[in-house]
Amino acid sequence: MTKLSKRQQQILEFIKQEVKTKGYPPSVREIGEAVGLASSSTVHGHLARLESKGYIRRDPTKPRAIEILDNDMAKEREKEEIISVPIIGKVTAGQPITAVENIEGYFPLPKRLAAGEEQLFMLEVMGDSMIEAGILDGDYVIVRQQSSANNGDIVVAMTEDNEATVKRFFKEKDHIRLQPENAHLEPIIVRDCTILGKVIGVYRLFD
């Protein structure tokens, strides 16, 4: 097993104790209070490392879904290199997309599925504007950070109104068309927009 830092060991032991005594894992806030960490983002970072090392497994859509892995499962996960992809809860104009205050958590992604990309983030999709591209309400898109796009790329873009949106990108004569993949919706026409990244994958939970 990959060696844990002192703080990671403290967090792991606290989670084990809470599950043993209460029957369910602690929240991020409770973990922070127990080990003396005021920042929830710092706790998320430690949990991501525990997950990448194969000690726990989390469900990013549920606040308390932390599962302690047994040794066999942990050893199996240790064989495969995992990267921690930040899940962005909000997009703020003028800030880097992965600024700490924007991060809600981390998602463990096998490196082989990242196509060699390092600068990734994930964003929850709200609405049905991209359903004809197979991106549904509640899906998480996996996004490669980049500031430019080719016509036809599905991107995360920040519009002039400082709204982040997932659309297909088209640069036309004197404007940019952000095209939904839904026949019932009209495109967004803007003079300019900021490209935050290109969508390279989708993560979905089935009921």
From Swiss-Prot:
Record key words, sorted: Autocatalytic cleavage, DNA damage, DNA repair, DNA replication, DNA-binding, Hydrolase, Repressor, SOS response, Transcription, Transcription regulation
Keyword Transcription in record: yes
Enzyme Commission number, as recorded: 3.4.21.88
Signal peptide (UniProt feature, chain positions): none
Domain of life: Bacteria
Recorded catalytic activity of this chain's protein: Hydrolysis of Ala-|-Gly bond in repressor LexA
DNA-binding region: 28-48
InterPro entries found in the cross-reference section: ArsR-like_HTH, LexA, LexA-like, LexA/Signal_pep-like_sf, LexA_DNA-bd_dom, LexA_repressor, Peptidase_S24_LexA, Peptidase_S24_S26A/B/C
Gene Ontology MF, one: serine-type endopeptidase activity
Annotated positions for site Cleavage: A93, G94
NCBIfam families in alphabetical order: lexA (TIGR00498)
Role, per record: Represses a number of genes involved in the response to DNA damage (SOS response), including recA and lexA. In the presence of single-stranded DNA, RecA interacts with LexA causing an autocatalytic cleavage which disrupts the DNA-binding part of LexA, leading to derepression of the SOS regulon and eventually DNA repair.
Family according to the record: Belongs to the peptidase S24 family.
UniProt-listed HAMAP family: LexA (MF_00015)
Protein name: LexA repressor
Organism (species): Geobacillus kaustophilus (strain HTA426)
Species lineage: Bacteria, Bacillati, Bacillota, Bacilli, Bacillales
